[in-house]
């Protein structure tokens, strides 16, 4: 671990699920980020997957009110697709999280640790991960 300072946070699908189930640590982390001027980022593809798979969409909406939703288009979508092919996964929401974290130099709040670490290693990004 080189101790590289991260510029922000990227939320993955696991962060949305944790927020939807009312996870206190997730909400505390989110409030702390906002109170310190950090606006977490979440890829649009992870937002879509969150609404597809989570019954408590009201809580997802609450969380999203304090985040920046990163569009999943153009160059970012191309890079995510290439990373997904290289790490042999069809989970674009996870790979999009790594793509955003690498490009923006962010730490990650997510759940799928194995895929995240594999994808991060492929792009040469030292992953700082808070697992929810």
Q: At which residue positions do the language-model features occur?
A:
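A short acidic, often aromatic-flanked loop/helix-cap motif at beta-alpha or helix-coil junctions
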Residues: 48-49, 75-80, 132
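Short active-site oxyanion
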Residues: 36-39, 66-68, 102-107
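Alpha-helix capping/helix-boundary segments
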Residues: 15-16, 46, 76, 96-97, ...
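Short, structured loop/turn "capping" segments at alpha-beta junctions
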Residues: 40, 90-93
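Short, well-structured N-terminal submotif of metal-dependent ribonuclease cores
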Residues: 1-41, 51-62, 122-132
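Acidic, PIN/NYN-like endoribonuclease modules and their adjacent C-terminal/linker elements
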Residues: 1-4, 98, 102-132
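Acidic catalytic patch
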Residues: 67-88, 99
């Amino acid at each position: 671990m080189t101790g590289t300072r991260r510029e922000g946070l990227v939320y993955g699908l696991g962060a949305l699920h944790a927020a939807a189930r009312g996870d206190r640590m997730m909400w505390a982390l989110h409030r702390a980020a906002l109170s310190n001027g950090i606006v977490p980022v979440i890829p649009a593809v992870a937002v879509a997957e969150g609404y597809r798979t989570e019954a408590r969409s009201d809580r997802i909406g609450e969380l999203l009110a304090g985040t920046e939703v990163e569009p999943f288009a153009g160059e970012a979508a191309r890079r995510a697709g290439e990373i997904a092919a290289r790490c042999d996964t069809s989970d674009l929401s996870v790979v999009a999280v790594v793509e955003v974290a690498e490009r923006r130099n962010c730490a990650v709040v997510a759940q799928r640790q194995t895929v995240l670490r594999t994808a991060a290693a492929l792009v040469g990004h030292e992953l700082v991960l808070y697992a929810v």
